[in-house]
């Protein structure tokens, strides 16, 4: 008789830590989707004069807990607003969400966590620190997509907390 051993690991346990080396910015957008990040970059570049500074990062590079902790210390801790778009819900980046939420609570950073797959996910709403009305507006903008919608996000309204 043969015994088969199976090893169960989370995504973060199979990754190698990465330091993105990004400096702080007023706004930070994190997503697993390169098209999301490209749209935000394009929108920001069109109207960069007068806009807050912006950093973009693909969450693929932030799977390992050490990568998350380093990014929080070096980049996110200096942000005024953070937008995270997740495909698949909390379980796909749970450690990161918990750490970023804790940072946002401690430093008063406006945090919006949105689904990137077009589905409602009330669990993600619980990680956001901004008013529900602002969160709904951001969901509509990001679901619309394109650089114009992303430009509207990078032009935050002070009354909205971003």
Regions found by a protein language model. Give the residues of each.
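Hydrophobic or amphipathic alpha-helical targeting/insertion segments
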Residues: 97-140
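A short, well-structured beta->alpha microelement
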Residues: 8-13, 52-75
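Structural motif
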Residues: 29-35, 60, 85-88, 116
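Single conserved hydrophobic/aromatic residue that forms the stacking wall/gate
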Residues: 153-162
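Cofactor-cradling patches in redox/metallo enzymes
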Residues: 81-100
